Amino acid sequence: MPFVRHPEQEDSLEERWLFEAMSECYIPLINVYDNLIKDNINFKITMSITPPLMSMLEDEYLNERYLNYLEQSIDLSENEIIRTKDNEELNKLAHFYNDRFKKILDIYNKYDRRLMNAFRKFDRLGVLEILTCSATHALLPLLTINPETIEAQIATAVQSYTECVGHKPRGIWLPECAYTYDLDEILKKYGIKYFISESKAILNASPKPKYGTYTPISTHNGICVFGRDMESSRQVWSSFMGYPGDFNYREFYRDIGYEAPMEYIAPYINRGGIRIDTGIKYYKITGKTDNKQYYNREMAMKKVRDHAGHFADGRNAQLEYAKEHMDVSPLIVCPYDTELYGHWWFEGPDFINEFIRMSSEDWTKYELTNPYDYIKENPIVQCSSPCPSTWGENSDYSVWLNPSNHWIYRKLHR
């Protein structure tokens, strides 16, 4: 999430990126965590909240703009209830969105219109481990020609986090999981204990780790490295078998902002007349067809429960098998973009809710933890040098450094 504060514009398209993430990802996840706590479900989860995002979530001006955005969403959904009154299926969905937007407003007000108040609470309760990130989401390995630039990125991130959360960060999400040699030395200087890496950083480490990504490794500077598990990753990310592509889930690309008559939708889109997403989407994925069917919330929630059960069963079997071949506790690290949960995959927060609840049931033999607690409980890990890598295509830097953009790096390094 880039820094998108534009008071010089009456209606900023970029600010809507933040507002959409707040309504579709962060507030729904806050609601999930609150309900789990209320129901006495023991859980631990880890989230990266970048310095720019923390700053924006605390910004009074942006919060005022978000409140206006949310009130507009409620107003639009109320008009949709009227507009769709002759279509029973659409009218039911219009009521669903109206109730949803009002619930989002209630949660927003509950935390005094500062979402970091919620995340700080979860941090204090020990259910949420908040990771920092580099100050401006810089791909750090491409800045090694100027090491002081990398140091400034980490120093600023740690300072920003400490001022906002109230203590220093224990872990960091390196942008795009991008690692290169000696980066851990700078992380150690600023008190970072661990980071998350792409699986190849572990699998191709030297010497080769005994247990692959099922345990972290330690760099020679004492920084623990947790590798992404690819089996659990594919079950969510894969365009062929990933859960979010199920035909019963909500279709992302069909929004009334693009389909409703301009004279009707104009007050709710960009004031320049640019059609944009409103968050009200009436169709399900259906399949590879333009003839989409109406979204059925009840059927989508049934699929959420099925997929959460499948995911929990898979992790249970995976860990039970690993235990038979290990003399230490195996760990599965499942990192995903936060925006997947609620924005791209509308039902994503519901999936997290169901998975955590199933993980607390007796039939699962594992427990949810976070990287820092795992280190405390398993302080002896293999020392190995992680392989330079990213979680981008080919696990290298080519997405960010290639013939289409290499010219800019000379200018950046000046």
Predicted regions mapped to residue ranges:
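Active-site and substrate-binding clefts of carbohydrate-active enzymes
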Residues: 1-42, 49-90, 99, 206-414
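Acidic (Asp/Glu)-rich catalytic clusters
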Residues: 34-42, 114-132, 151, 162, ...
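Hydrophobic faces of well-ordered beta-strands that scaffold small-molecule active sites
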Residues: 45-47, 130-133, 170, 194-197, ...
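Short, solvent-exposed turn/loop segments enriched in Gly/Ser/Thr/Pro and often Arg
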Residues: 46-53, 134-136, 171-180, 371-376
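Active-site-proximal, glycine-rich beta->alpha crossover segments in alpha/beta enzymes
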Residues: 61-124, 130-144
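His/Asp/Glu-enriched short active-site or ligand-binding loop at hydrolase and phosphoryl-transfer sites
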Residues: 139, 192-205, 367-370
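CE4/NodB-like, metal-dependent polysaccharide N-deacetylase domain
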Residues: 147-174, 316-326, 330-333
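Hydrophobic, small-residue-rich alpha-helical packing segments that form membrane-like cores
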Residues: 178, 183-192, 208, 222
